[in-house]
Amino acid sequence: MASPPHQQLLHHHSTEVSCDSSGDSNSVRVKINPKQLSSNSHPKHCKYSISSSCSSSGDSGGVPRRVGGGGRLRRQKKLPQLFERASSRWWDPKFDSVNLEEACLERCFPQTQRRFRYALFYIGFACLLWSIYFAVHMRSRLIVMVAPALCFLLVCVGFFLFTFTKLYARHYAWTSLALTLLVFALTLAAQFQVLTPVSGRGDSSNLTATARPTDTCLSQVGSFSMCIEVLFLLYTVMHLPLYLSLCLGVAYSVLFETFGYHFRDEACFPSPGAGALHWELLSRGLLHGCIHAIGVHLFVMSQVRSRSTFLKVGQSIMHGKDLEVEKALKERMIHSVMPRIIADDLMKQGDEESENSVKRHATSSPKNRKKKSSIQKAPIAFRPFKMQQIEEVSILFADIVGFTKMSANKSAHALVGLLNDLFGRFDRLCEETKCEKISTLGDCYYCVAGCPEPRADHAYCCIEMGLGMIKAIEQFCQEKKEMVNMRVGVHTGTVLCGILGMRRFKFDVWSNDVNLANLMEQLGVAGKVHISEATAKYLDDRYEMEDGKVIERLGQSVVADQLKGLKTYLISGQRAKESRCSCAEALLSGFEVIDGSQVSSGPRGQGTASSGNVSDLAQTVKTFDNLKTCPSCGITFAPKSEAGAEGGAPQNGCQDEHKNSTKASGGPNPKTQNGLLSPPQEEKLTNSQTSLCEILQEKGRWAGVSLDQSALLPLRFKNIREKTDAHFVDVIKEDSLMKDYFFKPPINQFSLNFLDQELERSYRTSYQEEVIKNSPVKTFASPTFSSLLDVFLSTTVFLTLSTTCFLKYEAATVPPPPAALAVFSAALLLEVLSLAVSIRMVFFLEDVMACTKRLLEWIAGWLPRHCIGAILVSLPALAVYSHVTSEYETNIHFPVFTGSAALIAVVHYCNFCQLSSWMRSSLATVVGAGPLLLLYVSLCPDSSVLTSPLDAVQNFSSERNPCNSSVPRDLRRPASLIGQEVVLVFFLLLLLVWFLNREFEVSYRLHYHGDVEADLHRTKIQSMRDQADWLLRNIIPYHVAEQLKVSQTYSKNHDSGGVIFASIVNFSEFYEENYEGGKECYRVLNELIGDFDELLSKPDYSSIEKIKTIGATYMAASGLNTAQAQDGSHPQEHLQILFEFAKEMMRVVDDFNNNMLWFNFKLRVGFNHGPLTAGVIGTTKLLYDIWGDTVNIASRMDTTGVECRIQVSEESYRVLSKMGYDFDYRGTVNVKGKGQMKTYLYPKCTDHRVIPQHQLSISPDIRVQVDGSIGRSPTDEIANLVPSVQYVDKTSLGSDSSTQAKDAHLSPKRPWKEPVKAEERGRFGKAIEKDDCDETGIEEANELTKLNVSKSV
């Protein structure tokens, strides 16, 4: 897995660094872009940072300049760089980094070695054929021609064997140079080898019998073909630097022509006159220029594609590593809020943005319909709903006794720190006891065992968890000098588990058994675990168990109605004589778990900095004598080493490792960060409870390195880039993909098509897509720019060959044939048109008209491009053959020169590497067969003349009469020898062309495949990051996530935050468990909550944060994002937005009821504002929550409110009334800790009647609703409140609270007065004076006052 530097490279940052072509640090420019904080904006995923702008071409984008006299701006067009990270030395294409260049040469070495071996095979095969040719025809002594060729064949065998040694891998460049010089020497030596008489043959036809001393063994066509082959091998397979190859090639051409002219065969090829000598030299020079132009082009493009492919494959490997990290990041992020089995289902839909997924959920499959027997079926499509019923699940609720008193004199930051510390211990213990943490509600902590994955020992897990929590809080009190205790309740039964809503979702459980478990905690005793009879049935006698005696302790009044005769028990600990499971005790006593052979050197999440230390491991081995083994679960524990303790103090094994990591002196220490933000290790990926906070800190820390040190980047840029390149090299060296990629390409070895048919179709349409998308040209490897270079080379070769052909007529003082002129004119028009279209397609595609753009897109298709390419690549050959006339048969210079030009026309088919090699090689074969046909076919219509052009070889007369041929027979060369030599020449040349075309197409396809793989990985990573962002926004607010990147914890005080609690008050009447345990009822509730969540996606409500859902209660707040508050026109503008949101929730419920056939839900809303504290609690499962009296009062405004109306406090009334809202004064209610409070109701009654009595009565407590919710307030326990009515209407009803649910039938279509006018909505009053109230934090002694039970339980 990736190391921390790799993490730094994975997460892009907003610092841009660029330099000039020289890479001088003095010219480095640093640009820091501001972070985009909008949750809806996603930065475009950039390529791996190895692709920097520090290249030889500088800024390829160009500088805008004004065109003409108008105001139109056009970018200045510049040539792109050779390849990404190319050096400024164009004459030696290399990377600008030594590390990258060495890695590229190392990774490309299999391809280099393979091509060099192919070159040895070709050279050896050519030597063998020429040896056979000379030996058969006895054109020279064997010792002169055959022996050197055979000796060189043995040398090639030696070179081939040398390629299998390690010495060749280190010195393959010197080996190529040595072979090149040997080939040069051998081929140049053949230039001055003359024909020598051979005894033993008396026939007059023997060529050597009457040979002159100046007659050479090879014709000019044969020797020129050998020159072409040598030069092409030099430029394509010898792998020497470009400047060295070019110098050697030019030197070889000069020596070749020098030797060839000096040892010219005067008998067959008389020297031209003095006037025509300069035309001869110019023509030969142009032919050699064509060879070098084609060779340099092939060399450069081969290097460009090779290095581009290396970068693409390297980026693909890096993106593969990124993909692993992003996948682990996303998995651990979602596992931090829900179990793995539930997360896997949710991950399937996480590939969409939250707002898009909401729309998709609204139109989901119609199969998800209401299935409750008492509800009539209706054609309503539900959102995806993941909830399942599980039996035999143990539920644990734990409450901190004395928390109100402890928090009375604590600041917000201190309180959040204490809760984070304490709940961190519980999270660690929950993980070790195999329980699944559900959530925290204020100071309440609850978890389950046997859900969502069944466990046979679920009851033992919860009991051990409860006992461990009691011990953990005892240690907490000793360390923090506090006086708090734990009250734990456990019950076993059936639950519904799943997720409700579309935003700020979390895994939760619901059922009546859940409520009963909550009741067990409320009726329990501090310091003991209160269990039900259902849980006791799953336990043996290992625990000290006593009767619960609930009635004796609390009385008969309400308990009998609550428990309904259920027997309860209290567990104080394990029996001393049979303590079977001691996991919690061992963890709390400073022991740590030993997992098999791997010794954990600290709590999970500390990374590998200490676990890999040999001294730490040795210290741990010394403690094996003190090992402890749990008799129940078999877990082995060892004493924790003192090195892991902080400052030598005894460490708590269940305590989170960074409870004190934020020191005033040092701040957060990366080494002691949570495990999720440390470099992800393989053994940590299976952990289902890890910290999201660590993920955010890791991303922020590594992404912020360059931001924090941006001022030093100009001086350290080179060092940073070297380290980056070194890390890039280290990563790709560990991956086998690079070697397999070059040595085993994913293509068919015969057809060269991709093995994947879909990839092959994509490859054939890639060029057209480049044109359609108008993709920018960045490097020479770009398909459109590569085509431009091919067309330019084709035009150059065509003009050069045409010029040399016309020069021969100038030298011979013969007018050129009309056919050649016509072909030249038409071909030149095609070449110029193709060149103009290519330039237009590369640089000015955005300026063409629509019709021209469609034409260019059609031309870029696979078949049209091949047809046009076949024409362009054949134009040089067509131009050469257009000069073949009857003069070709009489003047020896014409067939020799035409044959030489035809050789260049054949090798020109190595151009246009984007086209099929089969097509180009086949066309080259057809063109190569042309000279062979011309040698044996006469073009002269008179049969009495020479029968074929081969007869012209036997005529050395300077006469141009085609019907006069008198050559002494003893000086004539046999025509068959020239024909056989030409056949051998073209066969070897075509063999080289077929080989090079195949290699170059493979190289081009590899480059495309590397690009596709890199883009595919980038797309996957971007999708992963989008999913992670989507999940992140649904776990905690975006601005909180940004803060957690740089801070260990998050807590913030807000002076004026708005809070609402909205409850579906009659959901208990709708809820039934007689069908699928009430699952379909919660499906309906999920739809309603989803509609509420959909409101939050509107821009008008962007300042509102959903906090949580508690059963059928929806909690939201505003004013928590200080950045948005500063942008607002008034500090209290968010309160108006929150109130409008509450009104919109009322409308949503009315619309929802219109689709219900028999039941109408009723919404009750409580509103309050004031100072509050927002923070993130937890270490393995984070929870964003808010605390304070403001939250408590808002909860009371809901629980004491009125159906279908919004109840607000007096402080909120003063603010909202000045915004134009009209309220009814209700009276006063008793709020715990606040006494009597005046409240107001919205909307105001329109008939000026007083409020009915049934609206003044107290609604059932949210904590004990029968809707299956756990119903606990986010802070302290909710008291049983009795309001004090200020005034009562004469006609008020006298209904009591027992009949409230039946009498409360408010009309859902109550006429509401619109209180806010357009001109008044933006007007706000001055600061609101608040009443001074004494804060009381003393808990009520009698726990019964917290129970408000309805008869329906």
Curated annotation (Swiss-Prot):
Bias-annotated ranges (Polar residues): 16-27, 1292-1301
Residues of this chain annotated as glycosylated in UniProt: N206, N955, N964
Residues covered by the Guanylate cyclase domain: 394-521, 1058-1198
Catalytic activity: ATP = 3',5'-cyclic AMP + diphosphate
Function of the protein: Adenylyl cyclase that catalyzes the formation of the signaling molecule cAMP in response to activation of G protein-coupled receptors. Contributes to signaling cascades activated by CRH (corticotropin-releasing factor), corticosteroids and beta-adrenergic receptors.
Family annotation (PANTHER family): ADENYLATE CYCLASE TYPE 1, ADENYLATE CYCLASE TYPE 9
Domains: entry comment: The protein contains two modules with six transmembrane helices each; both are required for catalytic activity. Isolated N-terminal or C-terminal guanylate cyclase domains have no catalytic activity, but when they are brought together, enzyme activity is restored. The active site is at the interface of the two domains. Both contribute substrate-binding residues, but the catalytic metal ions are bound exclusively via the N-terminal guanylate cyclase domain.
Protein name: Adenylate cyclase type 9
Organism in which the protein naturally occurs: Homo sapiens
Gene: ADCY9
